[in-house]
UniProtKB/Swiss-Prot annotation:
It is found in: Secreted. This is Muscarinic toxin BM14. The keyword Transcription does not apply. Negative results: does not bind to receptor M1 (CHRM1). Is unable to compete with alpha-bungarotoxin for binding to nAchR at concentrations up to 100 uM. Does not manifest cytotoxicity toward myelogenous leukemia cells. Is not toxic to mice at doses up to 3 mg/kg. Its main location: secreted. Keywords: Disulfide bond, G-protein coupled acetylcholine receptor impairing toxin, G-protein coupled receptor impairing toxin, Neurotoxin, Postsynaptic neurotoxin, Secreted, Signal, Toxin. Disulfide bonds join 24-45, 27-37, 38-72, 76-90, 91-96. GO terms for molecular function: toxin activity. One of its GO terms (cellular component) is extracellular region. Residues 1-21 form the signal peptide. This toxin inhibits the binding of [3H]quinuclidinyl benzilate to the M2 muscarinic acetylcholine (mAchR) receptor subtype (CHRM2). The lineage of its organism: Eukaryota, Metazoa, Chordata, Craniata, Vertebrata.
C-alpha cells in the first residue's frame, strides 16, 4: 500500500511539473493547433497577427484576427512589436493563443 501511494505521488509530481513549465499553443499556418512545452529560457508565449497599413489587426470575414504564428519567446519586446505588417503580442496566460483578440 505504501509503495502504491509513493508511486502515485511521484507520478503526480512528474505530470504536474510543479507549475514551472510554460505551455504555449503552437500554430502551423493556418492549423492545426498543438500545445507544446517551451524550451528552457523561453518562458513567454506570443501570437503574431497580420495587420493593415494602419496597424489594425486584419480580420477573417470581419470577425477573427488572422493569426500567423504562435510560440515561445525569451522576452517580450512589448505590445505592437514586429514589422509594419506583422504584429507580435505576448500572452498573459499559460496555453494562450485562442482566436480572441486580447493578448
Amino acid at each position: 500500500m505504501k509503495t502504491l501511494l509513493l508511486t502515485l505521488v511521484v507520478v503526480t509530481i512528474i505530470c504536474l511539473d510543479l507549475g514551472y513549465t510554460e505551455m504555449c499553443n503552437m500554430c502551423v499556418r493556418p492549423y492545426p493547433f498543438m500545445s507544446s512545452c517551451c524550451p528552457e529560457g523561453q518562458d513567454r508565449c506570443y501570437k503574431s497577427y497580420w495587420v493593415n497599413e494602419n496597424g489594425k489587426q486584419k480580420k477573417y470575414h470581419g470577425k477573427y484576427p488572422v493569426i500567423l504564428e504562435r510560440g515561445c519567446v525569451t522576452a517580450c519586446t512589448g505590445p505592437g512589436s514586429g514589422s509594419i505588417y506583422n504584429l507580435y503580442t505576448c500572452c498573459p496566460t499559460n496555453r494562450c493563443g485562442s482566436s480572441s483578440t486580447s493578448g
